[in-house]
Amino acid sequence: MSILFYVIFLAYLRGIQGNSMDQRSLPEDSLNSLIIKLIQADILKNKLSKQMVDVKENYQSTLPKAEAPREPEQGEATRSEFQPMIATDTELLRQQRRYNSPRVLLSDSTPLEPPPLYLMEDYVGNPVVANRTSPRRKRYAEHKSHRGEYSVCDSESLWVTDKSSAIDIRGHQVTVLGEIKTGNSPVKQYFYETRCKEARPVKNGCRGIDDKHWNSQCKTSQTYVRALTSENNKLVGWRWIRIDTSCVCALSRKIGRT
């Protein structure tokens, strides 16, 4: 198409020059050589553009094809921080430093004292060691009696040694590992829980609440801690589970009271 355009354009240019010039005209040889050069230039341009396209296609064909990520098939376990039941090892125990909670303890013996952060709570110890009250707890009890302060609800704290199941942060029922085999002696998992002694410490509900305008009741509250658990007896790992951690007073306004 471009060659035809060049020929028509040159013929038109020659006609104009023939009309405007007297006896002189463009030599026939020079005109033919000009046409030949234009045709050669156009052919060379087309050839170069075709070569560039071929080089680009060859380069793309040599590149490795990117594979799409394979979706796990149904029932296939994806790689995660959880391990199969048969592969539970000391690596999970090393992770306790990262997932450590003061209310969760891995030990080869039953704990006799509350965690350091909860020494000032009303701890219910093991009956065997109930008489071994530490001087620190005795001093705190005496100091508390002189302050004239009372709790709205009465709570008690203790180490739970037989926890077998719990609800995780997704709302799923999971199995709590009671014993973990490591090396020479297995270790057990203990949970320091706090709950209400009774729903109504006084006749009408919580202590110190105006019962003319309010209904009150002591309720155990839960929070999340990290614990070694398994789901469907397959994958073992550290999960967030709910345990009893406090006793609070729940209030509701009495109907007809303002």
Swiss-Prot record:
Listed GO MF terms: growth factor activity; neurotrophin p75 receptor binding
Disulfide partners: 153-218, 196-247, 206-249
Residue stretches of biased makeup (Basic and acidic residues): 67-79
Summary of the tissues where the protein is detected: Brain and peripheral tissues.
GO CC aspect terms: cytoplasmic vesicle; endoplasmic reticulum lumen; extracellular region; synapse
Keyword Glycoprotein among record annotations: yes
Signal sequence region: 1-18
Organism field: Mus musculus (Mouse)
Keyword entries, A-Z: Cleavage on pair of basic residues, Disulfide bond, Glycoprotein, Growth factor, Secreted, Signal
Gene: Ntf3
Name of protein: Neurotrophin-3
